Design a protein with these regions (language model features):
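Structured interface patches
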Residues: 1-183
Length: 183
């Protein structure tokens, strides 16, 4: 759904959209398991910068809900995430702040996104919000043992017979010092 600046100049735009799995590209590792439900409102916020300059920001306030499958960072088993997120975002026209050699940015301004042209695509905003809702590293369980670095077996399922420790000869001098200290 494209949120057009022209429509926002007339009235706020309410949205209630359902995006099936695969409609919004969430990347290779994230798989959408259920429809993404989104609803909210887009408004035009006019900001007066100086006597004759008006900046038309777009404010999108809403919520989304979906179910995602992400591989565990240690063992690669699929992990299900239920995502429910509210958002209140402000988008400013790209290039509107140009002309200044150096800008000081307040904490509030750090939260501002930018749009080009006549509006913005709701799907881009939703993609960003879904990905921000996920943890940086997904782990299937706290005690996940991961994959064997030698044979690739899932150590949560089987115990492999690989040698646990391969000695790196570059560490031998430090090992000798440690052995002397332990005596």
């Amino acid at each position: 759904m494209f949120i057009e600046l022209e429509d926002l100049r007339i009235h706020p735009v309410d949205f209630r959209e359902v995006f099936g799995p695969g409609v919004i590209d969430l990347g290779e590792e994230v798989r959408q398991r259920s429809p993404l439900l989104s609803e909210g409102r887009a408004d035009l916020v006019e900001e007066h910068h100086g006597k004759h300059k008006v900046v038309e920001d777009i404010r999108i306030k809403g919520k989304l809900e979906t179910s995602l499958e992400v591989p565990c960072a240690r063992c690669l088993d699929p992990v299900i995430h239920q995502v429910e997120r509210s958002f209140d975002l402000l988008y400013r026209p790209l290039g509107n702040d140009s002309g200044h050699e150096e800008l000081s940015v307040t904490d509030a301004e750090a939260e501002i996104g930018y749009y080009e042209g006549d509006g913005l695509l709701l799907e881009d905003t939703l993609r960003e919000q879904v990905l921000l809702a996920l943890p940086l590293k997904t782990i299937c369980r706290e005690d996940c043992r991961g994959l064997c670095p030698h044979c690739g077996r899932n150590l949560n399922e089987v115990q492999c017979s690989c040698v646990d420790e391969l000695e790196d000869p570059r560490w031998s001098a430090l090992k000798e010092i440690r052995d002397k200290l332990n005596q």
